[in-house]
Amino acid sequence: MAAKDVKFGNDARVKMLRGVNVLADAVKVTLGPKGRNVVLDKSFGAPTITKDGVSVAREIELEDKFENMGAQMVKEVASKANDAAGDGTTTATVLAQAIVNEGLKAVAAGMNPMDLKRGIDKAVIAAVEELKALSVPCSDSKAIAQVGTISANSDETVGKLIAEAMDKVGKEGVITVEDGTGLEDELDVVEGMQFDRGYLSPYFINKPDTGAVELESPFILLADKKISNIREMLPVLEAVAKAGKPLVIIAEDVEGEALATLVVNTMRGIVKVAAVKAPGFGDRRKAMLQDIATLTGGTVISEEIGMELEKATLEDLGQAKRVVINKDTTTIIDGVGEESAIQGRVAQIRKQIEEATSDYDREKLQERVAKLAGGVAVIKVGAATEVEMKEKKARVDDALHATRAAVEEGVVAGGGVALVRVAAKLAGLTGQNEDQNVGIKVALRAMEAPLRQIVSNAGEEPSVVANNVKAGDGNYGYNAATEEYGNMIDFGILDPTKVTRSALQYAASVAGLMITTECMVTDLPKGDAPDLGAAGGMGGMGGMGGMM
């Protein structure tokens, strides 16, 4: 086992604090409407330019191992805030730095670190309750656009696009961000349920100009099996032909004789048919077939539950207003499934989301909810260069997370004002002893830090602005973009409550651990390895030479 370097007490804390400050100073220059960019060097390709706090934090590694431990702990704050709310990473870092700096001063002055931490925790718990009380629900498009604009660094077009996307697909809908092809940002909305499977044969195409299959009011056959024998399907095909409607077959696979017969029937115009593979694999495929069945009011023909394809009737088939199938995707528009059944299915999947342990599973389940409950919107980000594209895409992603958080828990006044108001309301809060009272004051003082940093980045005097804001009440604050005071809600400067809450909770959690640190242990730097020089080896060789 490698030898360790151990530091105690003040020596350890000073080193750790230095690391905290290096990382936080790099991150906090990005805060606010007048925050600056940070350029990150990459081992290959062009450097990345960003104003995203967590992207900056992730890039920082310090040479001194003790300082690096401090930096990594603050990086954890930014990462946790990012995971919880998708935004507010810079705010969380600024809060953590303020609490650690003030807290370690108190420790150096002889306060008990454990009581300080208890005081900080007490203040944060009370602050979270106050934030909830200040929170206003965010439901209209204008507020959603404002939240998106602020989070995308005052880019109004991004805010409007996100509000429009949420308007189109609903709050449950999936909104994804992709690279665009032009200079302008675009919004693409897919109505209905879409999945990534195309037609099994190009001979099904009935719209040669678009290369797609479009079927109006079709029946939809759902089968959890491979279909290779056409005899199994004859009863269903005959019934559909009599009804004079088209048929869409969604099965594990359709192959051989069955596929050939369907193609011939389609080309002769006997019955319009199109076949696609079912989406997903294994258990996920079964679940997605069941989703489609719920949406279209059909039944999945599955041998697991004793159903046979030969015995299927028109009652077992789903229906939709329209189905569009192209080379890669199938879209089912306006399924005839009962609303109550769809809502029941959505509730069931939501329960699974709560119980899901992996992020991947959770994401796939959320996609299924969106496809059932809303739709899918794609924001295509336009930019002139790849470097700009990366930076803009990261901002749009942040804005998207912020608007989701706003819809979830509401909004509070932005620009650091909400935390200043919360701190003022908690001025009378006391702990069980004097050291806890100091801890409470440390946390309350730290709550001014985001406002001060926004002002500092705008080139103004933080203390003057902070005092002016504290002298006001309610949503009165400072708009750093226009350098004027007024009602932050009227200015359209809103922060999602969830983002502010998460930033404060994670900052206090990690900062509390750092304040109570008394000892730090790391590997000693490895000295130069002893040189097992060429001479020794060659000596042996010389001996061998003598033997020859």
From Swiss-Prot:
Its main location: cytoplasm. The keyword Transmembrane helix does not apply. One of its GO terms (biological process) is protein refolding. GO terms for cellular component: cytoplasm. It is found in: Cytoplasm. It catalyses: ATP + H2O + a folded polypeptide = ADP + phosphate + an unfolded polypeptide. CDD domains: GroEL. Together with its co-chaperonin GroES, plays an essential role in assisting protein folding. The GroEL-GroES system forms a nano-cage that allows encapsulation of the non-native substrate proteins and provides a physical environment optimized to promote and accelerate protein folding. Belongs to the chaperonin (HSP60) family. This is Chaperonin GroEL. It comes from Klebsiella pneumoniae (strain 342). The lineage of its organism: Bacteria, Pseudomonadati, Pseudomonadota, Gammaproteobacteria, Enterobacterales.
